[in-house]
Regions:
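Glycine-rich, aromatic-bearing surface loops/beta-hairpins
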Residues: 82-137
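Long alpha-helical, hydrophobic tracts
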Residues: 1-32
């Protein structure tokens, strides 16, 4: 997570408002809108809600940074609103040996979705990443 904080600090130094999410759970999903499911603390979901509800469609760009790991593919995802100079950072990861259905699903779908939710899943936000090739080995 040092990388995520370094990336956020770089954006902040350029005048961006940043939100760093710290999921307690990250999992892959293969059903409709295949991608990642992140469970974050309620306090972080509140901050995300304030940012996204201003103009949800403006969070349309993303960057992906791979982090070195042995058997996992680890990423820092940055979802950006250039219109509002806001960036949301969160980690994701999966094991390509175990999550083969995930790889197949996102390749077939042509996108990767990230669903960010609270523990009881009563509130959720979803972002679409349009280039699944960036997420697969």
């Amino acid at each position: 997570l040092d990388d995520i904080n370094t990336l956020a600090a770089e954006y902040e130094s350029e005048g961006w408002e940043t939100i760093v999410l710290h999921p307690g759970d990250v999992s892959t999903t293969v059903e409709e809108n295949a991608g990642f499911r992140l469970v974050v603390p309620e306090s972080e979901l509140e901050v995300l809600d304030e940012a996204v509800n201003k103009d949800e469609e403006s969070f349309s760009e993303f960057e992906l940074h791979r982090a070195p790991a042995e058997s996992l593919l680890m990423f820092v995802v940055t979802v950006k609103s250039n219109k509002h100079d806001q960036a949301i950072f969160f980690p994701t990861y999966y094991n390509p040996e175990v999550d083969k259905d995930f790889i197949t699903a996102v390749q077939k779908q042509g996108a990767v979705f990230t669903k960010i939710t609270n523990l009881d899943q009563s509130r959720q936000y979803s972002f679409c990443h349009s280039d699944p090739a960036l997420f697969v080995p």
